[in-house]
Amino acid sequence: MVRRRTQTFRYIQPLTFLKKMHTITLIFNLHQPFRLKKYRFFDIGNDHYYYDDFENEEVIHRNNSQTYEPANRLLLDLLQKYPQFKVSFVLSGTLIEQLELYTPETIRSFQKLVQTGRVDFLAAPYAHSVASLFDEKEFEYQMRLHTRKIQSLFGVEPSVACNTELIYNDEVALTLERLGYKGVLTEGARHILGWKSPNLLYTTASSKPLKLLLRNSLLSDKLQAAFGRYDSPDYPYTVDKLLRAVNGLPENEQSVILYMDYEVMGTIWRDATGIFDF
C-alpha cells in the first residue's frame, strides 16, 4: 500500500532534466548475464566449465558497438552542452564484470560521464537476481556487493535502490531502509495505484523514511516498446509529443520518471529509426 506525501523529488538523489514546471528523470538499466553453454549428457563428469565465453563476448561487443559506445558518446555531448541535463544508471554487477573482461574502454567511457558531476547510479542486486523473494541475507549481500563495486569504479555511493525488474514489497522496503538507502524505484503499476498518479513521491506503511519513486510506465513504454513501431498510434514518436504529455500534467505532478533499458538506443531500436536523434 502506498500513500501520497507532500515532498517533491528535490529530496531524492536520481538526477534529472528540467523542463518548465516539470522534471523528467532519466534512468537507464543495463544488464547482461553470464550465459551458460549447451551441456550435453556425455559432458557430465568430463567438462566442468559451464560458461559460454564465446557468446558472452559476442553479445558484449555487439551491444557495445550498437548501444554503449554511441549512447555514452551522445550523453557526454549532452552533459557538456546542457548544464541542467542529468542522468542515472543501473548497471548490474555481472555486466560490469563482462565489460571489464571484454570492453574495458566502456568502463572508462562511463567514468568520463561521471566526471561531469551530473551522473548518478542506483544500487541493485549484483547478479540481477530475485533473491529478495527467497533469501533476505543473499539479497542484502548482493546489494552491499553492488554498492561497493559502484563506489570502487566510479567513486559514487548510491543512495537509491532499484530491485531486479522493479520487484517491490514491504519486506524489501524494510531491508533497504536497514541498509541505509534513502529511496527505492519501483513500477507505477496502474492496478496498484488505482486513481493515484505515478508522478508523485510516496512512502510506505512499513518504512516511512524510505521514499518510493514510481516509474511512469505509459511514457517509458512509448519509448522502449513503441518508438519505432509503424503500427503505433503515436508513430512517429517525437520529443514534442513527449514534452506535450509531460507539460500537460497537473502542476503538482512535478516529476516524471522514465526508466528503460539502455539498449533502447541502438539495439532494441536501431540507429535508422532515429532513436539517437530523439
Language model segments and positions:
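Active-site-proximal acidic segments at structured loop/helix or strand boundaries
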Residues: E251-F278
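Catalytic alpha-helical scaffold of carbohydrate-active enzymes acting on polysaccharides/glycoconjugates
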Residues: F17-V160, L166-D221, G228, S232, ...
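Low-complexity, intrinsically disordered or signal/transmembrane-proximal segments
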Residues: Q7, Y11-Q13
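A ubiquitous, low-specificity "background" feature that marks scattered single residues
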Residues: Q13, F17, R148, T267-W269
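Charged/polar low-complexity intrinsically disordered segments
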Residues: R5-Q7, K19
